[in-house]
């Protein structure tokens, strides 16, 4: 018996080898999804042909065993998805005839199946998942929606059978690795060989009965599968139409958003190319899995494919792809807010640049520009200093556009916030060789509008009409730029979010209010405009003029504050002081005070009349003041006791005479300085005056000497004539 069984096995192996050699060989490592799909179709057609052959045996011999008794062989046979054929007692020719007939039927059934699948697959060209794995999600939904329990049980059976079929592919790969072939015939042959050896050990009777039970189950499965496939095809067509409509709407919406935002992101074409998203629409990405793992991955991919945005960023890792939907919404919100902020910044910048004057500032190095950005100051040559000061007084805004020599870029632009001032803390500029800090002018305070750089290539289209229409990048330090050209150049700079333009606009308005403040026509306004430190006059910082400037003595300084209500007691004093331009030197003429000598000043001072009568603090209207003693007509009266409380606080004793004390002290100081200056100047001027007098007297002396000489000559001539006459008279006498 053992020898016979071995001979039969050898014969069967030879037949299987012949069948295997008829199939063309393929590379095991290559994976062809189309051949895999053809294999699955052939498997289904083989099951149908085998079912037709087994109908005769089922009618003759009914099933004896229940489904529970054959659960083990059923699982093995269904998992391999092969029809087990008992070859016991069959010759080789009969076996070949059966295989030939089976292959003919399979060809016809395959042709019908391909026609039916081509109609359904043409509607969805980009979906490449096989039919069995693609319908798992819909089975679970249909199970929940089934109205009757019979329908739910039927769908449950379908899901179980499909799960068993999905595990077939992994087992076929194992069998193909063992026997050296991945074709269907080879794997089926190897599985048939293993099953035949098991059936021979268990007995021929059990094999026939198990085959009949499997055939019955296969019939039920095929009927359920056909119904389910028809329903699923209809559902697929409906869902495909819905998915296509949704995708078209999403694509149109994304195109609109892209036009509005004007971004440079790559759109829909990257969705199928990016491997980092782990969303694959190829055939092999789903078929390579097995069982429930493949179904779970497929469900996640379906959800991700529906919710994915057509705008795809380059991301790596699955975590980025999972959190992409939330980040895309944040990006949309951020983009809208950024657009609003940038629009607001642009409008504010245009307001700042309106009616401004633009100057090109050339720096020798980057260090000075960095120092200017850090401290908000700038210094330039005296020639440019005068130009910028005049522009600051006349223009609404003065914009300085900075550029480092040979850098190929603009380093930003700023607005002048003050005129130049001298005498402040020194700024350690990095100066070129041969240049000292004394060669620079004053220090300007500037407010930076943009600290970011702009390459020259982006401003190549701008020319400066005020520099012979040369490119705006060309120019010397202090070159003025035309208004339109300067505005366009500043708008080309990238926006600097770190700058608050609102404060800059507030400073501009404050400066405009100060310059346009109305003044009274009669006399100059008593309220001095409040000058900040940067707007002080250059002479206030003069180092050489170390003497303190004479202070204008207003009665008290409270009225200089804004919102001050004038005290009625000062009306008379103010009217008196307005008549005298300078109270300290009211009796001395201005030309004598400025240009005269000390003697002239003393002479004028002594010729001055008596001081005006003392006028103390006049009381409030309606309050009488006791008359002064005649002795105190021209002098301050002694301090009096505080009057009783009369509705207001009395003026302190020191405040009454503070003005007088300051006035006397200033008088003494000025007199001393005038005397010393007069003495020094007198000493220097005396020899010069003597020389001048001598020079003046020299022509007079010459004239006098000449006249004297002439007079002497005339007298001598007269004497000679007289002497001659006398001599002649005497001679005539003697002759007589």
Swiss-Prot record:
Compositionally biased tracts (Polar residues): 63-90, 186-197, 281-290
Gene Ontology terms: cellular component: nuclear speck; nucleus; plasma membrane
Record key words, sorted: Isopeptide bond, mRNA processing, mRNA splicing, Nucleus, Phosphoprotein, RNA-binding, Ubl conjugation
Glycyl lysine isopeptide (Lys-Gly) (interchain with G-Cter in SUMO2) crosslink location in chain: 96
Principal place of residence: nucleus
Segments for region (Disordered): 1-339, 510-564, 616-652, 678-736
Subcellular location(s) per record: Nucleus; Nucleus speckle
Domain of life: Eukaryota
PTM info: Tyrosine phosphorylated.
Null mutant phenotype: Embryonic lethality. Conditional deletion in germ cells leads to infertility in both males and females: mice are viable and grossly normal but male mice lack any germ cells including mitotic spermatogonia, while female oocyte maturation is arrested at the primary follicle stage. Ythdc1-deficient oocytes contain large cytoplasmic RNA granules, show extensive alternative polyadenylation, thereby altering 3'-UTR length, and massive alternative splicing defects.
Domain YTH residues, every copy: 356-493
Biased composition (Low complexity): 316-326
GO molecular function: N6-methyladenosine-containing RNA reader activity; RNA binding
Binding residue positions for RNA: 362-364, 378, 429, 477
Protein name per its UniProtKB record: YTH domain-containing protein 1
Organism: Mus musculus (Mouse)
Taxonomic lineage of the native organism: Eukaryota, Metazoa, Chordata, Craniata, Vertebrata
């Amino acid at each position: 018996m053992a020898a016979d069984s071995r001979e039969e096995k050898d014969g069967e192996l030879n037949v299987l080898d012949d069948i295997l050699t008829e199939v063309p060989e393929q590379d095991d490592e290559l994976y062809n999804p189309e051949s895999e799909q053809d294999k699955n179709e052939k498997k289904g057609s083989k099951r149908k042909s085998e079912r037709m052959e087994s109908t005769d045996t089922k009618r003759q011999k009914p099933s004896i065993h229940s489904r529970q008794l054959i659960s083990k062989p059923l699982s093995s046979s269904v998992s391999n998805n092969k029809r087990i054929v008992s070859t016991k007692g069959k010759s080789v020719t009969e076996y070949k005839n059966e295989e030939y007939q089976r292959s003919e039927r399979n060809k016809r059934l395959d042709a019908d199946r391909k026609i039916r699948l081509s109609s359904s697959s043409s509607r969805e060209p980009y979906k490449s998942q096989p039919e069995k794995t693609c319908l798992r999600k819909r089975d679970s939904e249909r199970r929940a929606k089934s109205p009757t329990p019979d329908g739910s049980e039927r769908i449950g059976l379908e899901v179980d059978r499909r799960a068993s079929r999905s595990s077939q592919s992994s087992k076929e790969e194992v069998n193909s690795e063992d026997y050296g072939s991945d074709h269907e015939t080879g794997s089926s042959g190897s599985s048939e060989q293993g099953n035949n050896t098991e059936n021979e050990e268990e007995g021929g009777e059990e094999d026939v009965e198990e085959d009949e039970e499997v055939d019955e189950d296969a019939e039920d499965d095929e009927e359920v599968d056909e119904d389910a496939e028809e329903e699923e095809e209809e559902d697929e067509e409906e869902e495909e139409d819905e998915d296509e409509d949704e995708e078209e709407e999403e694509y149109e919406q994304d195109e609109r958003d892209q036009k509005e935002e004007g971004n440079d992101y790559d759109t829909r074409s990257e969705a199928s190319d990016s491997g980092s998203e782990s969303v694959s629409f190829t055939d092999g990405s789903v078929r390579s899995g097995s069982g429930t793992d493949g179904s779970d991955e497929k469900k996640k991919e379906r959800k991700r494919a529906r919710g994915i945005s057509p705008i795809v960023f380059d991301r790596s890792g699955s975590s980025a792809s999972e959190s992409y939907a939330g980040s895309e919404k944040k990006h949309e919100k951020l983009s809208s807010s950024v657009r609003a902020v940038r629009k607001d910044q642009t409008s504010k910048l245009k307001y700042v640049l309106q009616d401004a004057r633009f100057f090109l500032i050339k720096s020798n190095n980057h260090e000075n520009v960095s120092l200017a950005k850090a401290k908000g100051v700038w210094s330039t040559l005296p020639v440019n200093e005068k130009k910028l000061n005049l522009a600051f007084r006349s223009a609404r805004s003065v914009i300085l556009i900075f550029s480092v020599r040979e850098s190929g870029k603009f380093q930003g632009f700023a607005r002048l916030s003050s005129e130049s001032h001298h005498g402040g803390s020194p700024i350690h500029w990095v100066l070129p060789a041969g240049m000292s800090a004394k060669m620079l002018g004053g220090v300007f305070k500037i407010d930076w509008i943009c600290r970011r750089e702009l390459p020259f290539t982006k401003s190549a289209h701008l020319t400066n009409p005020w520099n012979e229409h040369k490119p705006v990048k060309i120019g010397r330090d202090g070159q003025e730029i035309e208004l339109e050209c300067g505005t366009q150049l500043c708008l080309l700079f990238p926006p600097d979010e770190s700058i608050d333009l609102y404060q800059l606009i507030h400073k501009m308005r404050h400066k405009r209010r100060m310059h346009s403040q109305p003044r009274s026509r009669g006399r100059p306004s008593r309220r001095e405009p409040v000058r900040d430190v940067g707007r002080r006059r250059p002479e206030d910082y003069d180092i050489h003029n170390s003497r303190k400037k004479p202070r204008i003595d207003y009665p008290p300084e409270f009225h200089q504050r804004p919102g001050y209500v004038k005290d009625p007691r000062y009306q008379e004093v103010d009217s008196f002081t307005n008549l005298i331009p300078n109270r300290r030197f009211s009796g001395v003429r201005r030309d004598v005070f400025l240009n005269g000598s000390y003697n002239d000043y003393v002479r004028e001072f002594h010729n001055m009349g008596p001081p005006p009568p003392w006028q103390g603090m006049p009381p409030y209207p309606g309050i009488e003041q006791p008359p002064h003693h005649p002795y105190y007509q021209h002098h301050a009266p002694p301090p009096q006791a505080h009057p009783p409380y009369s509705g207001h606080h009395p003026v302190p004793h020191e405040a009454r005479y503070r003005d007088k004390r300051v006035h006397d002290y200033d008088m003494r100081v000025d007199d001393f300085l005038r005397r010393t200056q007069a003495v020094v100047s007198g000493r220097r001027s005396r020899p010069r005056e003597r020389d001048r007098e001598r020079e003046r007297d020299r022509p007079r002396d010459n004239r006098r000497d000449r006249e004297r000489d002439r007079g002497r000559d005339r007298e001598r001539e007269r004497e000679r004539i007289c002497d001659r006459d006398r001599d002649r008279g005497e001679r005539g006498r003697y002759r007589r």
